[in-house]
Design a protein with these regions (language model features):
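Alpha-helical segment proximal to the catalytic Tyr-Lys
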Residues: 133, 152, 178-179, 244
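Active-site helix of classical SDR
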Residues: 128, 165, 173
C-alpha cells in the first residue's frame, strides 16, 4: 500500500482537541496539507502547535469557524480553494453534546434539541454542500463523516438528540454517497465507540461511576476504551486510495462493542 494521501488537501472540522486533533496529526503524518477549523480558537491553535511539533515539515493551517453558520463555512471553503486550488478530503468531525447531560424526554427543551442537531448534522450538511461543486469539478474526492455508536444503537449517556443526530448523519452519508458517486466522490462514515478524548467525554465518564465504567469495558470485546488514534486511522483509510471502491459505508470502530451486521 502506498501513501496515497501525500500531497492532498484535507479540511477537518472539530479539530480543537481529541479525535479531531488526532485526525489532523494522522493526515499530516501521511503528507496531507491540513486545514483545521473549530469554534474554540485557543485550543485550535494548540492543535496547530502539536502538529507542527510532531510532524516534520507539516502544513497545518487553522481558522475559527462556526459550523452552524453557512456564511462562515462558505467563506472558509472559498479561502481554502483560493489558497490551495483544490480540496481532496473533508472530515466532518465537529459534534458533541454541547455540555448537556441526561434528562427525561419531557424535560428536553426545543433549544436543547436543536443545538445538538445544528452542530452534529447541520454542520456536516453545510460543509458537504460547500465542497461539492469543487469536488465535482475535480472528478474525485473523499468525505468522511464522524458519527457514533449511539447513531447505530442508542446513547450510553441517554441524550436523545445526540443519538438521533448521529443516526441522521449515517443516513446523510448513504444518501450523499448515492448522489455523488457518479462524480467520483466517495462518502463514508466512522462510528466510534466510547473514547475519552475531550471535556465532554471526561464528564460523561466521571458521571457513570465506577460500576457503570466497569460494565462498559466488560461489554467491549477487546476490553478497553478507544483512543483518538484508533478513530484517526480509520478516517485515514477511508480518505486514502485503499478505499477507492468503498462508498456509503459506516464502520464501527468500537473494540467490538456493537456487533452489527
Amino acid at each position: 500500500m502506498g501513501n496515497s494521501i501525500a500531497g492532498r488537501v484535507a479540511v477537518i472540522t472539530g479539530a480543537a482537541h481529541g479525535i479531531g486533533r488526532e485526525i489532523c496529526l494522522e493526515l499530516a503524518r501521511r503528507g496531507a496539507t491540513v486545514w483545521a477549523c473549530d469554534i474554540l480558537g485557543p485550543e485550535l491553535q494548540e492543535t496547530a502547535a502539536v502538529v507542527d511539533a510532531v510532524v516534520s515539515g507539516a502544513h497545518c493551517k487553522t481558522r475559527r469557524v462556526d459550523v452552524t453558520r453557512p456564511g462562515d463555512v462558505n467563506s472558509f471553503i472559498n479561502e481554502v480553494q483560493q489558497a490551495e486550488g483544490r480540496i481532496d478530503i473533508l472530515v466532518n468531525n465537529a459534534g458533541g453534546v454541547v455540555g448537556q447531560t441526561l434528562q427525561p424526554l419531557e424535560g428536553v427543551s426545543d433549544d436543547d434539541w436543536r443545538v445538538i442537531f445544528a452542530i452534529n448534522l447541520d454542520g456536516a450538511f453545510h460543509f458537504t454542500r460547500a465542497v461539492t461543486p469543487m469536488l465535482k469539478q475535480q472528478g474525485r474526492g473523499s468525505i468522511v463523516n464522524i458519527s457514533s455508536g449511539a447513531g447505530r444503537s442508542f446513547s450510553l449517556t441517554g441524550i436523545q438528540a445526540y443519538a438521533s443526530s448521529k443516526a441522521g448523519l449515517i443516513g446523510f452519508t448513504r444518501q450523499t454517497a448515492r448522489e455523488l458517486g457518479e462524480f467520483g466522490i466517495r462518502v463514508n462514515c466512522v462510528a466510534p465507540g466510547f473514547v475519552r478524548s475531550n471535556p465532554d467525554t471526561e464528564r460523561q465518564w466521571d458521571a457513570m461511576g465506577e460500576e457503570a465504567q466497569k460494565r462498559l469495558i466488560e461489554g467491549i470485546a477487546l476490553r478497553r476504551l478507544g483512543k483518538p488514534e484508533d478513530i484517526a486511522k480509520a478516517v485515514a483509510f477511508f480518505a486514502s486510495d485503499d478505499a477507492l471502491w468503498i462508498t456509503g459505508q459506516t464502520i464501527s470502530v468500537d473494540g467490538g462493542q456493537w456487533m452489527l451486521g
